[in-house]
A protein has these predicted regions:
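ER/secretory pathway lumenal C-terminal domains and tails of membrane proteins involved
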Residues: 2-3, 99-104, 117, 133-143, ...
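N-terminal membrane topogenic signal
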Residues: 2-15, 110
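Alpha-helical transmembrane segments of multi-pass membrane proteins
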Residues: 21-31, 384-391
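Extracytoplasmic catalytic/substrate-binding loops of multi-pass membrane glycan-assembly enzymes
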Residues: 28-40, 50-62, 76, 290-295, ...
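Hydrophobic alpha-helical transmembrane segments of multi-pass membrane proteins
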Residues: 48, 80-84, 345-348, 424
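Loop-to-helix entry region of an early transmembrane alpha helix in multi-pass inner-membrane enzymes
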Residues: 56, 68-91, 95-96, 108, ...
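Phosphate- and divalent-cation-binding pockets in alpha/beta enzyme and binding domains
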Residues: 60, 509-513
Length: 775
């Protein structure tokens, strides 16, 4: 190719990365956020193991990154890690884009400008930007991996044939193996690499090292390496072993001295080692976050974590929603990317960028077929193939007017899975801008010199800033602190050495963050209703040693309550007596033996002292009876083992689960965001009143919490489009529930000033509800 010898513009790629990084830093989240953000930041801090597949590459790299004091706040450091990895990906996309444009725009500076326009559009696409300013997921690291392997393939395609060039492919294999230990999204650049290899030098696949590299990479990425340890276990294990031995024999037969063959196998094994070496070693040290407990190098627990068995996904042939609705959800997300905040103009912007992207692909097809097919393979893998593979339920908001909640839906929007597709489409839009710049330059031949003709076409570059201005109001995470504040507020609602039973991700992961990263109220034991259906979470609760409650460093709220003798377990001379009983009386083997479902009688009664529990089990037709889930049985055990020994609380976020399943409403009293369980039926009085919203309320405790402790200003903060993420908006309603309830209490007590103040907080929260934001 005529432009092959032109050196890659690494310096300008660095400039492009720096510009995107500046945008991300300016809109960076100052702390944690909802969903998986808190889990990943906390896991990085304690070198823990987050949810399957464990993401060891992220944990190790982010932990190392977090040791460097880039910022005083640890969460900001990890959020900055997301920003840097995304910006580096933009720099690599600049290199790829510039190389692909060489047959479209022969003039260097217009080409650089068009390549920059593409990466600016890609980097400010709504999902890419939103995920680059907070470490909600591990996908910015995966996107960096995709960009890297594509650039390595492009670079390999321009290199001279020979052993030196072959080493680039082995490097690609290493990167693919390594990034698979972060997330499988990172390997989705492989089809583009395959296009480059088969188009440029198809004979390379017959070299002895190449089949070994491809095969070992395949069995490593898809977690079949352990099959080699027990070849007789089944047909799959036998097949993996036979093919592996055959390829080794073939490589030795062809050239026993071929160093590249050994290098290829070694590269894959070293790259994948974080999965098979690091995970079991670290799990055996029982870090505070140890999801799945994948202890043992060839253990079933490790296999289950790597294969995500916990989630129980159905076969790809068993679609969780019709494929056309799954694609419709993807297209809905695509429509968010280019000007999400400009509601009236968003559709036009989507059409414009769709047109530019297709123009870019067509122009690339005309100028560089190899690159065009690679781009198509990459886009197809990151979009249609990924939609098919992920097999999601109906999107959270797709076809809501038609189906409402009458179809199985995802619990949240899943646009982040497709951020790679949106970034690559932004690059293609940059190619489209280059195509139309070339068209204008060719059309204006009478305008004089070539620089003058290119100058006439430069206004097209302004199209690339549309996503920046169209997305910045909601893609930005600057000033958003609700997740951190909720966690701190909820923990501070719990008495010293209390047990707090929570419901799901958004009311649990922030608590992990608050305890492990901020060091807030580590004396509180956390139990999650959803996670208590797993063995590992019950073991984690059992093993956890309760840190001391430092009364001297407590909030004034708790100092006052301790001084007034209003806290269980008060020790003589002040302070709080630390409980000595284990949270679970059962041993770990006994906890492991708990069945997933336990049969119970309909409305079965259980009485402990003055506490009477009415168990409302779920009727399961297959079992012809009523059953209690493992998590509910574990909850009963927590109550039985700790009632009168440790304060027990249920979070307000649990949707009144203990009321419905155990009939505990007469025993629960709200103290702000948490409801304390009492050992006997509660009697209303001057300080204990009834609210139609949440049942009994401790007025004095809640009054002090909501005005002296809680960060309600963070919730009522005005946002240009309200709370953007509807699925997590229920967290705001929890605050609203408390303040609305207290407004009623104040009104009934004749305190009109506080009633109005609480109403104003509620109204401020209601104004931010998801219905007011874009979807």
């Amino acid at each position: 190719m005529q432009f092959k010898d032109e050196h890659p513009p690494y310096a300008w790629a660095g400039v492009a990365a720096a510009v995107l990084l500046a945008i991300y830093v300016a809109t960076l989240s100052p702390t944690t956020a909802f969903w998986d953000t808190s889990e990943y930041i906390a896991a990085a801090k304690v070198l823990g193991i987050p949810h399957p597949p464990g993401n060891p590459l992220f944990t190790v790299v982010a932990h190392t990154w977090g040791l460097i004091p880039w910022a005083a706040d640890y969460a900001v450091r990890i959020n900055l890690f997301a920003a840097v990895t995304s910006a580096l990906a933009s720099g690599l996309w600049f290199l790829v884009s510039e190389r692909w444009m060489r047959g479209i725009v022969p003039a260097r500076w217009p080409r650089y400008a068009a390549a920059f326009a593409g990466v600016l559009a890609a980097g400010t696409a709504w999902t890419v930007w939103n995920q680059s300013v907070v470490n909600e997921k591990v996908y910015t690291l995966s996107m960096l991996s995709v960009a890297l392997v594509v650039w390595l393939a492009v670079h390999w395609g321009d290199a001279e044939p020979g052993p030196a060039r072959d080493r680039w492919l082995i490097l690609v294999g290493y990167v693919l193996a390594l990034t698979s230990t972060n997330h499988l999204m990172g390997v989705l650049g492989a089809p583009a690499v395959a296009v480059y290899v088969l188009w440029t030098e198809p004979k390379v696949i017959l070299k002895p090292w190449a089949p070994l590299l491809g095969w070992f990479l395949t069995i490593a990425v898809f977690n079949h390496l352990p099959d080699l340890a027990h070849p007789g276990a089944g047909p799959t294990e036998m097949l993996v072993t036979v093919v592996t031995l055959a390829l080794i024999v073939y490589a030795i037969w062809r050239d026993p001295k071929d160093q590249l063959a050994y290098l290829a196998v070694g590269a894959v094994l070293v790259g994948i080692s974080l999965n098979y070496v690091y995970l079991p070693i670290r799990a055996a040290q029982y870090p505070p976050i140890n999801e799945g407990e994948p202890i043992g190098f060839l253990s079933q627990a490790l296999s289950d974590v790597l294969n995500r068995v916990q989630y129980g996904k159905p076969s790809l042939m068993d679609r969780q929603a019709p494929f056309y609705y799954q694609m419709a959800t993807f297209l809905e997300y695509f429509g968010w990317q280019w000007a999400r905040n400009w509601k009236a103009f968003a559709g036009i912007a989507t059409g414009l960028f769709a047109f530019l992207g297709f123009s870019g692909l067509f122009g690339l097809w005309r100028s560089d077929r190899r690159a065009a097919y690679a781009a198509i393979a990459l886009l197809g893998t990151l979009s249609v193939a990924l939609v098919f593979y992920m097999n999601f339920k109906y999107g959270f908001s797709i076809a809501w007017d038609k189906f409402g909640n009458n179809v199985p839906r995802e619990v949240r929007e899943r646009d982040y899975f497709f951020m790679g597709a949106f970034a690559v489409w932004g690059v293609c839009a940059g190619l489209g801008i280059a195509v139309w710049m070339r068209t204008i330059a060719d059309f204006t031949t009478r305008a004089g010199t070539a620089p003058a003709r290119w100058a006439i076409s430069t206004p097209l570059l302004a199209l690339a800033i549309i996503p920046f201005f169209g997305n910045r109001a909601t893609a930005s995470r600057a000033h958003e602190t609700v997740a951190r504040d909720l966690a701190v507020d909820m923990l501070q609602s719990v008495a010293p050495y209390g047990i707090l039973i929570t419901a799901g991700d958004n009311d649990t992961f922030p608590l992990w963050f608050a305890q492990e990263v901020l060091g807030v109220r580590t004396d509180v034991t956390l139990a999650n209703l959803s996670l208590m259906n797993t063995d590992w979470h019950l073991r984690q609760i059992k093993r956890r040693e309760t840190p001391d409650f430092d009364a001297t460093d407590a909030l004034p709220y708790w100092k006052d309550r301790i001084k007034a003798g209003d806290v269980p377990g008060e020790a003589p001379g002040g302070g709080i007596t630390k409980p000595t009983n284990p949270v679970f009386q059962w041993s770990i083997p006994q906890l492991d033996s708990m069945a997933d479902l336990t049969p119970v009688a309909k409305d079965q009664k259980v009485t402990w002292d003055s506490l009477q529990i009415t168990i409302n089990g779920s009727y399961i037709p297959q079992g012809n009876g009523y059953y209690l889930e493992k998590s509910d049985l574990a909850t009963l055990m927590l109550i039985h083992d700790n009632l009168g020994k440790r304060p027990i609380y249920f979070s307000i976020t649990d949707a009144f689960h203990p009321d419905q399943v155990f009939g505990l409403r007469p025993y629960l009293v709200a103290e702000g965001l948490a409801r304390r369980l009492y050992p006997a039926p509660v009697k209303p009085g001057p300080n204990i009143v009834t609210s139609p919203y949440i049942g009994y309320i401790d007025v004095n405790a809640t009054d002090k919490l909501i005005w002296d402790v809680y960060h309600y200003q963070a919730v009522t903060r005005k946002r240009p489009f309200g709370w953007v993420d509807p699925p997590s908006g229920s967290i705001l309603t929890v605050y609203g529930l408390i303040y609305a309830s207290m407004a009623q209490v104040y009104a009934e007590k004749g305190d009109s000033a506080k009633a109005r103040k609480a109403e104003q907080v509620y109204e401020g929260i209601a104004a931010q509800m998801p219905a007011n934001g874009p979807r």
